[in-house]
Amino acid sequence: MDNLIKDMRENLNSYSFKVVSDLVKELDVNRDNKAQIKELADLLKEDKRKNVSSLGNRLEKNLNNLIKEEERVKNMYFFDKSFGDYKYVAGVDEVGRGPLAGPIVSAAVILDSSNLDDIILYINDSKKLSEHKREELSEIIKEKALSYSISMCDSKEIDEKGIGYCNNHVFIKACEGLNIKPDLVLSDGYLIKNFNGENKHVIKGDTKSACIACASIIAKVYRDNIMKEYHKKYPQYDFEKNVGYGTKTHVDALKEVGPTEIHRMSFLKNIL
C-alpha cells in the first residue's frame, strides 16, 4: 500500500474515478494499516474532484468506525480486569434455555487480557451478530483464547432434572472443562450454584464482558450447528431456521406430526 500511496500522491490526477473507487472497495481497513488508510483518506479528500473526495470521506468514516470498535472492545477487556488482580478470568454463558427442542449448551472462555494489541474485534452478545459473523468470530475466538470449553445437557436430561438444574450444570461443566483453572469466573445473569471457585455474576454480561461475549458466541454457533444437523433428520420442524424455538412452523408441525426424540416433553404441556 505504501507504493500505491506514493504513486497517488504524485499522480492522483491520472487515476480515473472508477480506478480509485475500485481500489477503495478492495481495501480492508484493519488494525495493521490504520496509518496508511488515514494518509490515503487525507490524500483523496484533497482532490478537487468531488466524487474522488467523497471516497476519501468514506475511507475516513470506515477508519473512525474501526477506532470506535477498538475502544468498545477494549472497554470490554478492561471490564474483565476490573474485578481485581486475577490472572485468569473466564467468562461463561449459555444458549438454548427456552427452546422446545434440542440441548442447552454452555461455553467457558479465558482470554489473554494482558495483550490489548491482539483483542478480538466485533465480539458482542451473539444474538446481535449475523450468523456469518458468529461463525467467523467463533473460529477466531477458539484460535486466540487461552482456553475454551463447551458443555451441554440434552432434552432427556432437561425433562428429568429441569431446565434450572441443567442450566447451572452446564455452567459448572464448561468451567471444569477448561485446561487452565480460572482464578475468577464471570457468569452471565446469575451466580453459579455449588461452584467450587471464585464467581461473580454480570447482568447482560455478554454486552459488557469480553470473555462472556466470546462464550456466548461459541455456545451459540455450537448449538446452532447441532440443530442444523437435526434439521436434516426432521426437516418438517424447520430446525435450521428456528433452532428449536417455538415458531408457528415448529408448533404446527408438533400438532400435526407430534414430537421427536429431541423435544423437551416438559416444555410441550401447553401445546400438545
From Swiss-Prot:
Subcellular locations according to the entry: Cytoplasm
Cofactor dependence: Mn(2+); Mg(2+)
Keyword field: Cytoplasm, Endonuclease, Hydrolase, Manganese, Metal-binding, Nuclease
Cofactor note: Manganese or magnesium. Binds 1 divalent metal ion per monomer in the absence of substrate. May bind a second metal ion after substrate binding.
Disulfide bond positions: none
CDD domains on file: RNase_HII_bacteria_HII_like
InterPro entries assigned to the protein according to its UniProt record, in alphabetical order: RNase_HII, RNase_HII/HIII, RNase_HII/HIII_dom, RNaseH-like_sf, RNaseH_sf
Binding of a divalent metal cation, residues: 93-94, 188
Enzymatic reactions: Endonucleolytic cleavage to 5'-phosphomonoester
Short name of one Pfam family: RNase_HII
Listed SUPFAM superfamilies: Ribonuclease H-like
Gene Ontology, cellular component aspect: cytoplasm; ribonuclease H2 complex
EC numbers: 3.1.26.4
Domain (RNase H type-2) ranges: 87-272
Any GO molecular function: RNA-DNA hybrid ribonuclease activity
Function: Endonuclease that specifically degrades the RNA of RNA-DNA hybrids.
PANTHER family according to UniProt: RIBONUCLEASE H2 SUBUNIT A (PTHR10954), RIBONUCLEASE HII (PTHR10954:SF18)
Membership in a protein family: Belongs to the RNase HII family.
Protein name: Ribonuclease HII
